[in-house]
């Protein structure tokens, strides 16, 4: 999942998966202490529920003890789980805010994207909003503004404000990921940690749809068709001027307004069949 995130411009922290204690020690020394130790199992969705996460591990000795305790705890609490080792992740010292970004595909309605307060906050406070891909930065900001955590992200009780433009870009990148892969049934990034203004994806989960996407349709899993890039073309005028012809976008409104200000009253009247005052 983290490889997907990096490909779509969603920042993550240094992470590696280790199949043994020796591999875990090697990973930890390469990444650098302190680290977070997590169980790696496809059968465990919420690691905290089985005590599968240790934070603040700052030495080889602490890692050895944590590794042994983690394996014993898992054998006791979920003995049938398939264990693929552990995940070693560089620890972020101070987390100011936690966010969640998720998506789920409904067979009739299509894919929808969720944004809101992350960590345990998504279950306790249920502060989230829903949007439909594709999302641009304007729609991403509107998605953020519909949540209560948006006010906190602007600075709260001495905490640094989050880089809202970066979070917009993360949402847009996530939307592009969901658009490109109809095979994804559900996905969530939880939490997205905001530290000193910058956001990082700490954990991600992907569930694949076992059914084949509908044939003959470019985006069978979306209720809104993405921007038709196939109609974008470049042309040369007689004087050699290069022009770009493309379908209009919502964010073109300021440019359209600017164009209207250059037109005469007669041109506007012939275009709209009545005077345009504003």
Sequence positions of predicted segments:
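ATP-dependent carboxylate/acyl-activation modules
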Residues: 1-275
């Amino acid at each position: 999942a983290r490889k997907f995130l990096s490909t779509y411009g969603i920042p993550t922290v240094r992470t590696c998966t280790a199949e043994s204690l020796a591999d875990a020690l090697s990973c930890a020394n390469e990444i650098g202490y302190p680290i977070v130790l997590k169980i790696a199992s496809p059968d465990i969705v919420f690691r905290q529920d089985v005590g599968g996460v240790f934070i603040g591990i700052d030495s080889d000795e602490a890692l050895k003890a944590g590794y042994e305790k983690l394996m014993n705890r898992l054998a006791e609490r979920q003995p049938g789980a398939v264990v693929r080792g552990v995940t070693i992740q560089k620890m972020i010292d101070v987390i100011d805010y936690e966010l969640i970004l998720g998506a789920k595909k409904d067979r009739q309605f299509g894919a929808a994207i969720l944004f809101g307060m992350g960590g345990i906050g998504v279950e306790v406070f249920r502060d989230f909003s829903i949007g439909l891909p594709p999302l641009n930065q304007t729609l991403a900001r509107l998605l953020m503004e519909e949540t209560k955590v948006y006010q906190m992200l602007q600075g709260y009780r001495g905490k640094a404000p989050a880089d809202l433009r970066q979070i917009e870009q993360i949402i847009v990148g996530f939307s592009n990921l969901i658009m490109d892969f109809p095979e994804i049934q559900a996905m969530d990034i939880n939490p997205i940690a905001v530290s000193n203004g910058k956001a990082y994806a700490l954990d991600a989960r992907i569930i694949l749809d076992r059914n084949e996407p509908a044939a003959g349709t470019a985006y069978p899993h979306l209720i809104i068709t993405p921007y038709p890039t196939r109609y974008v073309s470049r042309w040369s005028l007689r004087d050699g001027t290069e022009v770009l012809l493309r379908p209009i976008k919502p964010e073109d409104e300021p440019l359209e307004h600017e164009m209207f200000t250059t037109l005469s009253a007669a041109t506007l009247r012939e275009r709209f069949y009545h005077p345009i005052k504003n």
